[in-house]
Amino acid sequence: MSKSSYYAPHGGHPAQTELLTDRAMFTEAYAVIPKGVMRDIVTSHLPFWDNMRMWVIARPLSGFAETFSQYIVELAPNGGSDKPEQDPNAEAVLFVVEGELSLTLQGQVHAMQPGGYAFIPPGADYKVRNTTGQYTRFHWIRKHYQKVDGVPLPEAFVTNEQDIQPLVMPDTEGRWSTTRFVDMSDMRHDMHVNIVNFEPGGVIPFAETHVMEHGLYVLEGKAVYRLNQDWVEVEAGDFMWLRAFCPQACYSGGPGRFRYLLYKDVNRHMRLTLNAPH
């Protein structure tokens, strides 16, 4: 497996001499948040956290993508929280893109490196801390877990993408693969957070149009991505946010790999009332 890279924003502030024209856009079907707009002045903070800031790149939004939130969290040395989550119904995935994250999950300590992935079920006891002298940056994806009578809660686990063999899509000669952290047939899970990998020349050869909402954070490389009726150039550090049924396709022209972290909601009946809880 090729050595992977993981883009992480560092903030900063543009000079007064820079042009304000950028690729940022928000439409009725999708949004593109390019890396150039993730600056210091748009960060947020949370109660019970020390030495942290975060970029909120997705949140439940009525009439758009409604099922998940996604943060990019930056921890300064000694930053973290002993009480990171206040919602007892929230499940989460943590994915480390820079530095080292010390995760204490149900009493067990894990030193998570870049590529590190943790699934945290609702109600789980956990703490996060940056115990190093360098900055740590990670994605925190949260969803209200949809319980089903007779289906147990999924178990917590911690792994690293380097320990998982990507599954190659058929008839692609290895140019399109997916690193899956959860078995697709495991009905305990109502969301998947995967990594999609394209080698140069790899494509999504049709306009995917489906019910699953998406958050796509580009970890590495660049490509041209079709969103609804638009072809958009994207690169490492960009985020694409798609509502249900937004058509999408991709062409990865190189010169290197194109990879993104992908959220989608799965394995549950569709709600039949608009204001029912997710």
Language-model features: where?
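Conserved short histidine dyad/triad with adjacent acidic residue
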Residues: N51-P60, S69-P88, T179-V182, N194-H210, ...
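Surface-exposed interaction/gating patches
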Residues: F157-G215, L219-Y225, W231-V232
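Short acidic-glycine-tyrosine-enriched beta hairpin
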Residues: G107-P122, Q229-A244
